[in-house]
């Protein structure tokens, strides 16, 4: 998936691997701490009691205030920046889940948003872990085509299914091709889901947003424990 825009709270990037040369070629002195920014190619670096923002190469350094437009506050410490990159309050984005027409698994009071690709093995493992938790949680499943043309076809079949419960069952058991399709299918929810994934910077699945806003980029080893914050 391609990113729609470099927005704060998108997917964090891989860690910087050459910290020593970076300190040599930049105006930053001793590096006391570093956090990956959810912005392409940038890190937040703490040095001598102040925070600056540095390109991955170390060539460019920006001195200023980082403001999170989604949560409407400045981020003034590495801990705040780290938390901003690892949590997500979808309500602050004005996002209505009904507009995305998610597949639903469970009937619990706690809502969990899950982006999956129907052809993703780790996504299926995640959904298996979700099945015993459906009394406590409601999993709102948003299929996105990460793995190519076959995924695009299956996502469309899920989105255009006449029966949403049948679509959820088909996703779980891998029989998407047997779904009865709605000839007058509305493609808007699928398009909105894709745009939402791009805005959030989702580059891989599964991507999970817990009921308390914590993010998991990938499948937790123990879904139940992760949802409980353990």
Q: Predicted segments — roles?
A:
Residues 19-156, 170-173, 181-205, 210, ...:
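Extracytoplasmic thiol/disulfide redox context detector
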Residues 6-15:
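Bacterial N-terminal signal peptides
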Residues 158, 215-218:
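Short acidic-hydrophobic, aromatic-tinged amphipathic segments that line or gate anion-handling sites
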Residues 1-4:
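Positively charged n-region of N-terminal signal peptides that target proteins for export
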